[in-house]
Amino acid sequence: MENIIKGIRQYYPVSDSSLEVLFSYMKKMELPKKHLLIHGGVLDRHVYFIEKGFCRSYCLRDGEEITIWFSREGDITFAMKDLYHNQPGYEYVELLEDCEKYADPD
């Protein structure tokens, strides 16, 4: 979880013991390139921590994919409306590489 720790500590001075508690609740996921991690219109309240890989968040407008942002190793990714408003959002997250991620539990 080296990349995730670096990503977190880039913004927050978190102790090793706090990180251990956080990681004890997380589930490891190894997913292939082109996997759709988050589907628009489907509620997904997870926060995904990226240890390895690269992904893109996008929405559909008139059938066209509009890229919103990219996430890389050490970043987090999630569907904003789903997480903040507990409503299915419009965002999709596609893995652009094979990825190793950690997610909060169901």
What role is predicted for each listed range?
Residues 1-106:
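Cytosolic regulatory regions built on CNB/CRP/Popeye-like sensor folds
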